[in-house]
Amino acid sequence: MDKKSSHPAGAARDILIELRNAGVYRDGRWLVRNVDLSVERGEIVTLIGPNGAGKSTAAKMALHILKPDEGMVSHKPGLRIGYVPQKINIDRTLPLSVERLMTLTGPLPRKEIDAALEAVGIAHLAKAETAHLSGGEFQRALMARALARKPDIMVLDEPVQGVDFSGEAALYELIARLRDDTGCGVLLSSHDLHLVMAATDRVICLNGHVCCSGTPRDVTSSPEYVRLFGSRAVGPLAVYEHHHDHTHLPDGRVLYADGTTADPIAGSTMGPRGHCHVEDGHHHDHEHHHHEGGQPRA
């Protein structure tokens, strides 16, 4: 996926959220401390770290869900935030359609619902019950719900949790495309080390505090990163920097970089404008897998 510079040379920085020396203290210990980060319009910033490193805590501070016990958190005035939590308290066994999920936090015009579902590639699932969605489809529905309110920034807490490998690649590709299409900022947290690296502009590595930060290449070459994740976490980065000019949508269509779509050629994994070969040794950003007798599912 092509990355866009968040602030080209000479352009004023448009900071949406900023944390300075922020920390949260609970039950006699610091959950996370000394966090410095900012997210600008059009920028993807990713929090990585092992379980318990403070990623969700830092994200909740950024959202003003948690008040910092030290330091400060500031938002741009009038900031609109779209939030996709790590866990959502919805009983998916109860009747709940995708379009109804979209309006749980408040009414939305029909055209906004339709546009958001189309943007994330699941317009064909508007009437579907959430209980029947795959993990990737449900995550897309949650992203659509956040996107429909036209946020300045999207905060995504472990957005690929419970999604298999090809689904993870597809969701990271989608996140980058939504950033490119809307110009919003993105703050996401992930325990993934490689797929996410190809989808982000800046990385903040947490382990109770900020271990290191910078571009993906800066972070993966940092001694602190290697100490935390081991040298095995460095080598495969380049594998995920191989990209195509297309994305496969869950409804079977092919979306190209110029915004056009096409139906795939029968018996092929690509449309008429390009080629995909899984045997070439690269991991591809396909957004579906095939199931017997059903729609492709992300």
Curated annotation (Swiss-Prot):
SUPFAM superfamilies: P-loop containing nucleoside triphosphate hydrolases
SMART domains associated with the record: AAA (SM00382)
PANTHER family per the UniProt record, alphabetical: METAL TRANSPORT SYSTEM ATP-BINDING PROTEIN TM_0124-RELATED, ZINC IMPORT ATP-BINDING PROTEIN ZNUC
Gene Ontology molecular-function annotations: ABC-type zinc transporter activity; ATP binding; ATP hydrolysis activity
GO biological process, one term: response to zinc ion
Enzyme class: translocase
Gene: znuC
Compartments, as annotated in UniProt: Cell inner membrane
Sequence ranges assigned to domain ABC transporter in this UniProt record: 17-232
Ranges annotated as biased composition (Basic and acidic residues): 276-298
Protein's recorded name: Zinc import ATP-binding protein ZnuC
Renumbered residue ranges of the record's region Disordered: 273-298
Highest classification ranks of the organism: Bacteria, Pseudomonadati, Pseudomonadota, Alphaproteobacteria, Hyphomicrobiales
Pfam families: ABC_tran
PROSITE patterns assigned to the protein according to its UniProt record, in alphabetical order: ABC_TRANSPORTER_1, ABC_TRANSPORTER_2, ZNUC
Major place of residence: membrane
Keyword Transport: yes
Entry binding sites for ATP: 49-56
GO cellular component, one term: plasma membrane
Membrane topology, from the record: Peripheral membrane protein
Functional note: Part of the ABC transporter complex ZnuABC involved in zinc import. Responsible for energy coupling to the transport system.
Catalysis: reaction(s): Zn(2+)(out) + ATP(in) + H2O(in) = Zn(2+)(in) + ADP(in) + phosphate(in) + H(+)(in)
Family membership noted in the UniProt record: Belongs to the ABC transporter superfamily. Zinc importer (TC 3.A.1.15.5) family.
InterPro entries in alphabetical order: AAA+_ATPase (IPR003593), ABC_transporter-like_ATP-bd (IPR003439), ABC_transporter-like_CS (IPR017871), Metal_Ion_Import_ABC (IPR050153), P-loop_NTPase (IPR027417)
Enzyme Commission code: 7.2.2.20
Record's subunit section: The complex is composed of two ATP-binding proteins (ZnuC), two transmembrane proteins (ZnuB) and a solute-binding protein (ZnuA).
Key words, A-Z: ATP-binding, Cell inner membrane, Cell membrane, Ion transport, Membrane, Nucleotide-binding, Translocase, Transport, Zinc, Zinc transport
